[in-house]
C-alpha cells in the first residue's frame, strides 16, 4: 500500500469514527436542545397547550382531541445531517482553514435552524389539527423540508468555499454568447 493510499484510508477511518462517536456522544444533548428550542419558538403562540416534560418530549394539548406526547427521536434530530456536513467539509477543495470553518459553520447553522423550524411546524400542526395530522405532516412535509435544508446547507458551504468568478469575466462570457 502506498503512502497516499494509507493517508486516504486513515482519513476515512477517522471521519467514520468521528461520525459514529459524535452521534453516540452528542445525540442526547442535541435532541434536548432542538426540543427546547422548538418549544421556545411555539410557546408564545401556544400558551399552556405545550409543556416540556423529561428530556426530549413535549406534551401537546391540541385544540380538539386528547393530549399526546411528541418525542424527538435520534432520527428526528439534525445531528446526523450536521455530522455528514462536517465529514464532507474534510474533502472540500483546498482553501484557508478560516474559510472552511466559516463555510461549515454557516451550513451547520442552516441545518440546525431548519430542523428546529421543522420540529416546531410539526408540533404546531399537531396542536391545531391533532396527533394524526402531526404524523402526516412530519412524515411527508417534514421529510421534504429536511432534504431541502440539508441540501441548502451543503450548497451554502460550497458557495462559501469555492472560488468566485470575477464579475467582469462573467460579463465577457455573456457578451461572447450574445
What is each PLM-predicted segment?
Residues 1-178:
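Hydrophobic N-terminal alpha-helices or hydrophobic patches in metabolic proteins across all domains
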